[in-house]
């Protein structure tokens, strides 16, 4: 299964509560932080919800 490198490129201070919770559930805390996640439909759905603050690359 492929992996995704997810980077938080914008601040989460202006996001609503559910979007902030989604970013936290992805494992991101501060602007500029990166995580690697499995490429699953659940992760893709979370990315789509907050795609305007993320950068995503396939590994």
UniProtKB/Swiss-Prot annotation:
GO terms for biological process: translation. It holds the Pfam family Ribosomal_L30. The keyword Ribonucleoprotein applies. One of its GO terms (molecular function) is structural constituent of ribosome. Part of the 50S ribosomal subunit. The keyword Ribosomal protein applies. One of its GO terms (cellular component) is cytosolic large ribosomal subunit. It comes from Acetivibrio thermocellus (strain ATCC 27405 / DSM 1237 / JCM 9322 / NBRC 103400 / NCIMB 10682 / NRRL B-4536 / VPI 7372) (Clostridium thermocellum). Gene3D superfamilies: Ribosomal protein L30, ferredoxin-like fold domain. HAMAP family: Ribosomal_uL30_B. Transmembrane segments: none annotated. Belongs to the universal ribosomal protein uL30 family. Keywords: Ribonucleoprotein, Ribosomal protein. This is Large ribosomal subunit protein uL30.
């Amino acid at each position: 299964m492929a992996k995704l490198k997810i980077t938080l490129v914008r601040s989460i201070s202006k996001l609503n509560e559910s979007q902030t919770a989604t970013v936290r559930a992805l494992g991101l805390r501060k602007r500029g932080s990166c995580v690697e996640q499995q490429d699953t439909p659940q992760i893709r759905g979370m990315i789509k919800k907050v795609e305007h603050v993320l950068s995503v690359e396939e590994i």
